[in-house]
Design a protein with these regions (language model features):
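Conserved catalytic/binding loops enriched for acidic/polar residues
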Residues: 141
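Short phosphate-coordinating micro-motif centered on Lys-Gly-acidic
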Residues: 146
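Conserved glycine-rich phosphate/nucleotide-binding loop
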Residues: 157-204
C-alpha cells in the first residue's frame, strides 16, 4: 500500500480514541510512542503523529482525572513544549476560539483537532459540540468522531446518560440493532467497549 508521507489528513486521529482509552494502562512515554506508531500505519507525517499524541494524552488524563479539562489541555501543552510545531499553533487557536473554516481543505486533521480542543476548553455539552461540528460542514462525520471522542472522555458515560440532551443519542448507540442494514460482527458492538472501559480501574 502506498503511503503519502506529506498527507495531513484526519484518518489517524479519527481512529485513535480506543488506543487513547487503553493508554490509561500505559505510562506517559508509552502512550506517546503508541500514538506515533498508530499514525505511522497510514499517516506518517509528523504533524499527524503529534496531533495523535496530544489527543491521546488528553484522553488519558481525563480517564485518570475525570472532569479535569484544564489538566488534559496542560498535558497536551507540556508534550508540545519542546517542538516548534504547527500542532501547537492549532492548540492555541483552539483555546483562543480561532476555528478554521471546515469547508476549506476538507479532510485536514486541523479541523477535527481544533474543534475538539476548543469544545474541551469551553466545557461544551456533548450534544452541542457535535451539533456545531456537524453544522460547520466539511468532513462532518470524521470531525464529529474526533470531537466526540474527546468530549466523551471529558463528560463520561454516566454524565452523558443522565442528561436529557445526550441520553437519547447514547441510547441509540448502545441499543442499536446490528442485524439491520449492513450488518457488522457482534464483537464490534458498542456494548463491548463499555465492558472494556469498565475494567480500567487501576492505572500505573
Amino acid at each position: 500500500m502506498a503511503i503519502n508521507s506529506e498527507s495531513k489528513a484526519n484518518g489517524a486521529l479519527m481512529r485513535i480514541t480506543p488506543l487513547a482509552v487503553a493508554s490509561a494502562y500505559y505510562s506517559h512515554e508509552e502512550s506517546i510512542a503508541l500514538a506515533y506508531k498508530d499514525a505511522e500505519l497510514t499517516h506518517p507525517n509528523i504533524t499527524c503523529q503529534q496531533a495523535n499524541a496530544c489527543y491521546v494524552l488528553a484522553i488519558r488524563h481525563l480517564i485518570m482525572q475525570p472532569g479535569d479539562s484544564t489538566g488534559a489541555i496542560h498535558a497536551a501543552q507540556r508534550y508540545l513544549e519542546p517542538f516548534q510545531s504547527e500542532v501547537g499553533a492549532w492548540l492555541n487557536d483552539a483555546l483562543n476560539g480561532n476555528i478554521p473554516d471546515a469547508t476549506r481543505m476538507i479532510g485536514f486533521v486541523r479541523h477535527g483537532f481544533t474543534r475538539a480542543f476548543h469544545h474541551l476548553a469551553t466545557g461544551s455539552e456533548l450534544r452541542d459540540a457535535l451539533f456545531h461540528t456537524l453544522q460547520a460542514g466539511g468532513d462532518t462525520d470524521t470531525n464529529a468522531c474526533i470531537v466526540g471522542g474527546l468530549l466523551g472522555a471529558y463528560w463520561g458515560i454516566d454524565e452523558i446518560a443522565s442528561k436529557s440532551s445526550s441520553a437519547p443519542m447514547l441510547d441509540r448507540v448502545i441499543n442499536c440493532d446490528t442485524s439491520l442494514g449492513q450488518t457488522r460482527p457482534a464483537r464490534y458492538h458498542a456494548k463491548k467497549m463499555i465492558d472494556h472501559v469498565s475494567a480500567f480501574t487501576v492505572y500505573r
